Amino acid sequence: MAKNYYDITLALSGICQSARLVQQLAHQGHCDADALHVSLNSVIDMNPSSTLGVFGGSEANLRLGLETLLGVLNASSRQGLNAELTRYTLSLMVLERKLSSAKGALNTLGDRINGLQRQLDHFDLQSDTLMSAMAGIYVDVISPLGPRIQVTGSPAVLQSPQVQAKVRASLLAGIRAAVLWHQVGGGRLQLMFSRHRLTTQAKQILAHLTPEL
């Protein structure tokens, strides 16, 4: 059966978008608010109509992730910011594989996400309450699966409880995207052997987005 590289690229961009948000938060203490909203919402939408539906039904919602994916696929250096993004992306993939083989953790994750949906009736998606709840899910359900993702950035910035919560919530969104990536036929070997296919697909999607003004 032929791989659907459109869906695979969208899901992979979702992982990369989360990685980029983590990087922005860790270095600057803030991040692209629209991209964060899209990524956080992907965790809560349990019944999307399509791969694109997970990310709000618009390719433009993944612009940050698509641009990050191209940087990761074409990174010539193992140092610096692209190396950080590659490490976060690969680490999320490893954790997702551990999650997929831990039935108890999967069940707990589903229950906790249902709890988030109830909280959304009373709190905004980017409120401190929801952010802390998502961070708590990451700490309680995902982190124990190991290995832990080492987030690097500004020590002063990373001391902030609000930044820590947003980082963990973004990592949870990355796990969601990694689950989706496997569901649509993604696999780590593609990063080695299908780089050109993924790069071409990402460029094609970005080409029909309206330029940012």
Curated annotation (Swiss-Prot):
Classification via SUPFAM superfamilies: YcfC-like
Keyword ATP-binding attached: no
Signal peptide from the UniProt entry: none
Keyword Glycoprotein: no
Pfam families: DUF489
Membrane topology, record value: Peripheral membrane protein
Coiled-coil residues: 79-122
Primary location class: cytoplasm
Location(s), subcellular: Cytoplasm; Cell inner membrane
Keywords: Cell inner membrane, Cell membrane, Coiled coil, Cytoplasm, Membrane
CC terms in the record's Gene Ontology section: cytoplasm; plasma membrane
InterPro entries registered for this protein in UniProt: HflD, HflD-like_sf
PANTHER family, per the entry: HIGH FREQUENCY LYSOGENIZATION PROTEIN HFLD
Family: Belongs to the HflD family.
Full protein name: High frequency lysogenization protein HflD homolog
Taxonomy of the source species: Bacteria, Pseudomonadati, Pseudomonadota, Gammaproteobacteria, Enterobacterales
Gene: hflD
